Design a protein with these regions (language model features):
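Secretory-pathway lumenal glyco-enzymes, predominantly type II signal-anchor Golgi glycosyltransferases
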Residues: 2-467
């Protein structure tokens, strides 16, 4: 009986087993595929990240200030540098910052350029890179490039350009996106070695619009830019308010009285003159003074009205003094000058997380960087460094492990150097929509890789007084 049941049910069991095996294999394959997809997009990696907090460390692990200070004073540090960019300069212009006419420069512009971008460099020379944009503000523009392997024709063309314009520095590293940190630090090294006589240094990609005028305005008063430029309008509005609200009733005095009393106004008291102009236009007193009045009556009226006039002048003079004091207080903002030892690292500041999906151009593995956040950093399309910040960050970089993304690397260096990146909205890391009148306070805008577009926009803004 049992044997009979087995024979009858065996085909059913075999069919069920085969079906279950197929279903099980299907789900196993689906699960494996899902795991691979999640891993590709970094889902599991995020769970393994270390929290970025006050205990953050990045090689070299430890305080580096003492070592940096030793290097800056040409002394041997207790710990040797762990990261130096020892590349050879194929094209050098070490005399670029030596000029008998200028002992120092206000700004040196360092343009990170690709070797083949000849037209972009030419457009920059003819716009914001023109070194005599303002005759009373000495500046220099320097292009930094790498090399292309086995492209002798391109190299020869670059050498001709360098010989003609004498504004190109070339080092023997491969010019590619993932070597931007090398390009940046080669620039730092060259500046520290050959061009320390500038108060500020601006690093810019060769596809950026730059307003030289706004750069100079910004470095004059970074904390209040661009608001402090709007103050004169406020002062002007205040003047008009005083003029309208404090105008008293007409005194009714004719010109003869003012001439008789020989009232003299200071040339600078334009506000008094303006307010008195309306006050001294009526001839009401002529209606009051008839020929029947005797000299005593006339003298009495003259004294009364003269006293009233003098009080008016006194009141208006007080307004002028108040306005002058107000303007002087405002002018202190305009004339603000950063101290020589300020450590300014300014641009558009970001706080973001590493890209963990492997398809990303900016993918970073846990072995490269294990934390869930980057240190605060500045997008490196355009940023400004004071001389002190440049020196401090250059020597600190020698104790910072190399990282292939230059903006992140400089963020790591700044954190080690205890330099807080300074944020300004007018450094546009994207291409700001252009209209004729919305670039008034723009310092930089990305997306101007077309030389003709840069020329057109920059020249239009220059004509408006914004570039």
């Amino acid at each position: 009986m049992c044997l009979l049941m087995y024979c009858l049910l065996r085909p059913c069991f075999q069919t069920s087993f085969r079906l279950a095996s197929k279903i099980k294999l299907k789900y196993v394959c689906i699960c494996i595929g899902l795991i691979m997809i999640l891993d590709f997009f970094g889902a599991f990696t995020h769970f393994l990240e270390i929290t970025y907090d006050s205990k953050f460390v990045y090689p070299y692990e430890g305080d580096v200030h003492e070592f940096v200070n030793a290097l800056r004073h040409n002394e041997k540090p207790d710990v040797d540098p762990i990261n130096e960019y020892n590349y050879t300069y194929k094209i050098d212009i070490r005399q670029k910052c030596e000029d008998a006419a200028y002992s120092s420069f206000r700004v040196v512009y360092i343009v990170k350029s690709a070797l083949e971008h000849f037209e972009r460099r030419m457009a920059i020379r003819n716009t914001w890179g023109f070194e005599k944009r303002f005759f009373d503000v000495p500046s220099r523009t320097i292009f930094v490039v790498g090399v292309h392997q086995e492209d002798n024709e391109l190299q020869a063309k670059l050498e001709m350009e360098a010989a003609k314009y004498k504004d190109i520095v070339q080092a023997d590293f491969r010019d590619m996106y993932y070597n931007n940190t090398i390009k940046t630090m080669i620039s730092f090294k060259w500046l520290v070695k050959y061009c320390q006589n500038s108060k500020f240094y601006m690093f810019v990609d060769d596809d950026m619009y730059v307003s030289v005028r706004n750069v100079l305005r910004f470095i004059r008063n970074p904390a209040n830019y661009p608001d402090y430029l709007k103050e004169p309008k406020k002062i002007g509005a205040h003047k008009r308010e005083i003029k309208d609200s404090d105008k008293t009733e007409e005194l009714g005095i004719n010109n003869s009285i003012t001439q008789t009393n020989s009232i003299t106004l200071n040339k600078n008291d334009s506000l008094v003159r303006e307010n008195l102009k309306d006050t001294l236009t009526t001839n009401e007193i002529n209606h009051k003074l008839t020929q029947d009045f005797n000299n005593e009556t006339l003298n009495s009226i003259t004294v009364i009205n003269t006293n009233s006039l003098m009080k008016k002048i006194s009141d208006q003079a007080e307004i002028v003094r108040n306005e002058t004091n107000l303007q002087r207080r405002k002018k202190q903002i305009f004339d603000f000058e950063l101290p020589e030892d300020v450590r300014l690292f300014a641009g558009f500041v970001f706080v973001s997380s590493p890209h963990r999906h492997k398809s990303s151009k900016w993918y970073v593995s846990l072995s490269e960087y294990p934390y869930h956040l980057w240190p605060t950093y500045i997008t490196t399309g355009a940023y400004i460094l004071s001389k002190e910040a440049l020196l401090e960050m250059y020597y600190t970089s020698m104790y910072t492990k190399h990282f292939r993304f230059d903006d992140i690397f400089l963020g790591l260096v700044a954190k080690k150097a205890d330099i807080e990146p300074f944020h300004c909205e007018e450094f546009h890391f994207y291409k700001k929509d252009y209209t004729k009148f919305n670039y008034k306070y723009v310092i930089t805008s990305h997306g101007y890789g077309n030389p003709n577009e840069l020329l057109n926009v920059w020249n239009e803004q220059k004509a408006l007084g914004n570039a």
